[in-house]
């Protein structure tokens, strides 16, 4: 009887430990986008050409986002890994990625269903997942 109870408790704990797949997908999208933004930032500094990142509307006809200003042959991916991901830049239409070493404070919110993640930089540090800002 004790063994049955232990198995029931262990399986209920395992059920609680399972993660939401959309949350994992959004975390993967955020990590990938942060890497792409830093790659574009490095290319911008290396070439001395201003590069910006713009999200695109969610539609079967458009790509998920685009990098404007990259030199030919140095293009980066323009699609999300999965369907339904969208991005919104806070306070401006595009992220400015250089060529200056300090680019200014910038934030964007990634969304997938009811999940949200914020990527941000203080202008000197790389883009990374950040805590949500609460209005005061």
Regions found by a protein language model. Give the residues of each.
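N-terminal helix-rich module
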Residues: 1, 9-42, 46, 50, ...
